[in-house]
Amino acid sequence: MDNFGINYPLSTIHYPLKRNMEDWEFEFEWLRVRHTVKDALKHDALPDLNVVLLMIGIQELGFWKKGWTKEEKQDLMHIAVCRLLSYDGYYEFVGLDTEGWPHYTLTQKIMLKGQGEQEQMLKEKAVYYFKQLEAERES
């Protein structure tokens, strides 16, 4: 079991795009994700996208430790981005290294315009990721 009470690993299923949701529905779901992470961390303030990515990276790594280094935090966020973008086939999971860290390979070029579009895409995928965690918890 991990920090979110979910068994690791999750199965990969194809991600439905945000365009199937109204903007207000997406904003509500993103707020739910932020509250889930805030509660898991026992913080008072809502986390930003970077903290959400960090927590997804830890979830995918499968273990928690106190005092992550700056480099480890960057690696965890990279793991999260790879995991989220694997829903659309941009990355493919290739396995774990000798220390148990997941590794991915880029399978296709990501064509996004600007930081805003990148952040929106990651938020959409994070919403989907947490919906999958919920579904796994309930099954």
Identify what each model region corresponds to.
Residues N7-L17:
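Arg/Gly-rich low-complexity intrinsically disordered repeat tracts
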Residues R19-K42, K131, E138-S139:
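Long, acidic, intrinsically disordered low-complexity segments
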Residues A40-L49, G67-L76:
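Structural motif
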Residues D44, E60-F63, R83-L84, D88-L96, ...:
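Amphipathic alpha-helical interaction segments
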Residues N50-G62, L76-Y87:
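Short, hydrophobic/amphipathic alpha-helical patches that form generic packing surfaces
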Residues W68-Q118:
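Amphipathic protein-protein interaction modules
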Residues Q108-E138:
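Helix-rich interaction surfaces within compact, conserved domain-sized segments
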